Amino acid sequence: NMNHRRKIKICINGRRVLLLSILCLFGFCLVAQVQPRRNATQPAKSKVYLLHADVLKKSKDNPDPNAQILVGDVEFRHDSIYMYCDSACFYEKTNSLEAFNNVRMLQGDTLALYGDYLFYDGNTQIAQVRNNVRMENRTTTLTTDSLNYDRVANLGYFFDGGTLMDEENVLTSDWGEYSPATKMSVFNYEVKLVNPQFTLTSDTLRYNTATKIASIVGPSDIDSEDSHIYSELGFY
């Protein structure tokens, strides 16, 4: 069906290996971590700067005596990314911070990341965003409750269920990643793609939000109003 092909093309074009790291604990909040794939070269370290806070104080209740407690219209900058929140703990010695409530990370006009909680490590350049998370990259939006964003790899990845939406399709899965630079996304476990013309279910799917091409790499079912197709390899 030509209308179907305009909406999405399904092909097999290469293999992808997905790696999940061992779960670990990090920071003052116990959150599950998934390490991204990185090149061997580590990022050059640069300083996280506090740009503004209505109130700055020390707190005896914080387990880190060097923590700066910030309240009201808090703003940080790290290289080209700006971070905003209602309150924060700034750990200047370790070049890291925790941000609470109304959290925003903005990088130019290409990337916006929102959530209720953020732990950001300026040395590794990894942001851990939790609860009501939304990543926006032009016409693509990724929503989840647990997302890590690796600034070096330019990769956002979720591991507790998520949804990616663009102009034509809605994709959901238990685990996934999205690259704002390449527009490529990878979905694993309980994958579902909903298009106005059909619904695709699979266990693994690759999807490019720029080209609207989906690559299936395993057993998949494609259902439309008048047909059902099962495919492991092939085109639709």
PLM ranges: what are they?
Residues N1-R37:
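Bacterial Sec-dependent N-terminal signal peptides
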Residues Q33-Y236:
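N-terminal amphipathic/hydrophobic interface segments
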